[in-house]
Amino acid sequence: MTDQNSASQGLMGRRGLLKSALGGTALAAMGAAVPQTHAAEKGEVNGNIRQSIVFWCFNAAGDKWDIEKTAQVAKSLGCQSVELVDPSQWGTLKKHGLVCAIAPNGMPGAPFMKGFNNPRYHEEVITRTKSAIDACADAGFPSVIAFTGFKWRDADDPSSGEIPQEEGFDNCVKGLKQVAGYAEKKGVTICLEHLNTRDDTHPMKGHPGYQGDDVDAVADMLRRVGSPRVKMLFDIYHVQIMNGDVIRRLGQHMDIIGHVHTAGNPGRGELDENQEIQYPAIMRKLVELNYDGYVGQEFIPTRDPLEGLTQAVTLCDV
């Protein structure tokens, strides 16, 4: 496994290559992430953006870090959280002075398949969400993830017929209202995620069949719940694919945004020069809007994960 010094050398090598190919001006336009790498490696961050590492990305791909390694890296880079971690592993986070910025909802299998849009799953989703809320309240962690679910009548069977969006969103409002009061009482926020349905190349790069794929419609639906503890997980990668105009939409929906995710597009890879999203500008907009939630780094590593994370954390540290 590559240590921090090796990662730093790799990044400096990339800087030299980029300068040769693109020139110093182009490198600066990309956010000038590389020259600041040493500060990120030492955990010296500005702190205007509270950053988090999404555990599954680095546990399932690349070097397949365990929770201990991921927590060590998060701490070394100045991140405050490792998220979507099972409560059984929260002790490791606390040992390193970290939080779980957003907790899993406890649904078995792919948790985004069976959600609030389908009444046949309401009992299980609500019960498991309440259990996750309890765990977060006990640990002092801020939020729990939620999903609309797939649009099929039977989430496992695309031939079972579709739930129309209006009906599905009405079901979401009804289901979320059943748990909103509990979340308010416990002081934990439910953050429902918008996902893209366009990318069908990889099971975690896109989610064809997911009902909540229009960020504007999802935001409007969540406002109908009318609870300060029911908000949206604004995933920049998914929004860019489905709707675009990310910076304007941040301002449009800041009232309902409770959590933010990143990844490079196309490909859900690193936040580097091979993708199209201008993360420094987006982070500056979040600061301008006084966003005080967390930003989770949720890219799937295609090269050395420490190098990619160091670059991403630095890029977003505006």
Residue ranges of model-derived segments:
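Active-site mouth loops of central-metabolism enzymes
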Residues: 54-64, 112-124
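Active-site-adjacent beta->alpha loops and helix N-cap segments on the catalytic face
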Residues: 90-93
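Histidine-acidic metal/acid-base catalytic patches
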Residues: 2-76, 141-142, 155-156, 202-203, ...
